[in-house]
Amino acid sequence: AILERGLQPGLLHAVEYSASFASELRLRFPSIHVHQGDAFSLQETLGAHADLRFDCAVSAPPLLNFPVAMRETLIGDLLSRMSPGRPLIQFSYGPFAPVPGRAGQWSVERYDFVLRNMPPARLWIYRQSGH
């Protein structure tokens, strides 16, 4: 869907934990950058692209399966790679934001509920403070 909206494939970086699914993504989308590894260790997973900055991000790890400290670290790491105010869209499968807002650091707002996702998902938008 992202590519259908006109994003140049060479600008898209995807992080996938599963080696087999990462291989499948590379076959299906040869022009995008697929990084196989752990999003919770983004610096290591990005390798040569470790200093990469994002215009925005879409994140879908099942955060509610992880300790709060790990969730906060992931959200903070992603937001630190973006300009203040740019959106981080996080999929989640619970009724509440997987990481609450942090005054002075980031805000969170409920964006949408996606029934077509299996299981149905809520979308949350996180933004770094300071804009």
Predicted segment positions?
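Conserved SAM-binding loop of SAM-dependent methyltransferases across substrates and taxa
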Residues: A1-Q8
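Conserved SAM/SAH-binding beta-strand->alpha-helix loop
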Residues: S18-S20, D38
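Conserved SAM-binding loop
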Residues: L25-R26
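A short acidic, Gly/Pro-enriched loop at the edge of an enzyme's catalytic core
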Residues: T45-C56
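A short SAM/SAH-binding and catalytic strip from SAM-dependent methyltransferases
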Residues: F54-M70
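A short glycine-rich, Lys/Arg-flanked "PGG" loop and its adjoining helix->strand segment in the class I
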Residues: E72-P84
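Conserved beta-strand signature within the Rossmann-like core of class I S-adenosyl-L-methionine
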Residues: M82-Y93
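Core SAM-dependent methyltransferase catalytic element
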Residues: F113-H131
